[in-house]
A protein has these predicted regions:
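A Rossmann-like FAD-binding core segment of flavoenzymes
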Residues: 5, 73-95, 101-104, 165-262, ...
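Beta1-alpha1 glycine-rich phosphate/pyrophosphate-binding loop at the start
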Residues: 7-76, 157-183, 253
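Residue-level detector of alpha-helix initiation sites
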Residues: 15-17, 39, 113-115, 154-155, ...
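A structural signal for the hydrophobic beta-strands that form the central parallel beta-sheet
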Residues: 80, 109, 133, 197-199, ...
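Glycine-rich dinucleotide-binding loop and its adjacent helix/turn
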Residues: 113-166
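FAD-site-proximal beta/loop scaffold in flavoenzymes
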Residues: 119, 125-141, 237-291, 295
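An active-site-proximal "capping" alpha-helix that borders the catalytic cofactor pocket
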Residues: 291-307
Length: 309
């Protein structure tokens, strides 16, 4: 693509926020392209069933929902380009990792958030070989086996309950002495006889050559260590916003989320005029598809207003 071709708006990210923004831009005749990113469709594509998105009384698979939205975007004539953004220059030149450069009048960042791993030696080698961040994707490989979930929030509790349906035993390894999850999710875990909770515990070592066979656990309250034999370890300790590529261009929180809202009339705009943001790369409290979609809509409408002025 010729680097001189200029877009009205480049949307970075293809989850609910990015694709919704694309729909609203297309309807307003704003020349738009979507850069899909390293997980086209976003995190929702690995969610087996979404039952809280309005309009689907019987629920809908996350992958199907995102493919339907993607097709809707394409039907409006918006190009969805496979690629990852390397950096954005101050004049809104968007450079992709393959060296291609796009020129735009405005940018909507909707890159979402990536899985937080334990950052232990050999972790990368063991991902897919006993280690996973997606219980719904990989859980069935551990039927009648012993697994553990690391974390204490809603996702960790949901994963543990899901895994208990077909595994032999589930450990929950949590570094605190109480969960951060909602009471509803906590009750499901606490009332499940197949789930054993290891409070005040942290994974300190991953053991196994070609695949994970056990982990070394430290009790951070009494200092005791023990080895836990496992067939699988599921990490559910949160997500990191995919914002490193911004490289100091826009203001970020300490957690990496993009700061917006300083302009009362353009609530989704960053501290850089013409760069807007929406979805999980902004919102650190509520990782919900419907919220991301709504923010994507607002970002598009506000980008349109800014472009007109």
């Amino acid at each position: 693509m010729n680097e001189n071709i200029k877009y009205d708006c480049v949307i970075i990210g293809s989850g609910p926020a990015g694709l919704t923004a694309a729909i609203y831009n297309a309807r307003a005749d704003i020349k738009t392209i979507v850069i899909a990113g390293n997980q086209p469709g976003g995190q929702l594509t690995i969610t087996p069933m979404v039952d809280n998105y309005p309009g689907f009384p019987n629920g809908i698979g996350g992958f199907k929902l995102m493919m339907d939205i993607q097709n809707q975007v394409k039907n409006f004539g918006v190009e969805i380009k496979q690629g990852i953004v390397k950096k954005i220059s101050g004049n809104f030149q968007i450079e992709l990792e393959n060296g291609e450069i796009l020129q735009s009048r405005s940018v909507i960042v909707a890159t979402g958030a990536a899985v937080k791993w334990l950052e232990l030696p050999r972790e990368k080698e063991l991902i897919g070989h006993g280690m996973s961040s997606c219980a719904t994707c990989d859980g069935m490989f551990f039927r009648d086996k012993t697994v553990a979930v690391v974390g204490g929030g809603d996702t960790a509790c949901e994963d543990a309950v899901f895994l208990s349906k077909f595994t032999k035993k589930v450990y929950m390894i949590h570094r605190r002495e109480e969960f951060r999850a909602s009471m509803a999710e906590q009750k499901k875990v606490l009332n499940n006889q197949k789930i054993e909770i290891l409070w005040n515990s942290e994974v300190r070592e991953l053991i196994g050559e070609e695949k994970l066979t056990s982990v070394k656990i430290l009790n951070n309250k009494n200092g005791e260590e023990k080895v836990l034999e496992l067939d699988g370890l599921f990490v559910a300790i949160g997500y990191s916003p995919a914002t490193k590529f911004l490289g100091g261009l826009v203001e970020l929180r300490e957690t990496g989320q993009i700061v917006t809202g300083k302009n009362e009339k353009l609530a989704t705009m960053t501290n850089v005029e013409g760069i807007f943001a929406a979805g999980d790369c902004v919102n650190e409290n509520h990782r919900q598809a419907i919220i991301a979609a709504g923010e994507g809509c607002r970002a598009a409408l506000e980008a349109q207003r800014w472009l007109r002025n």
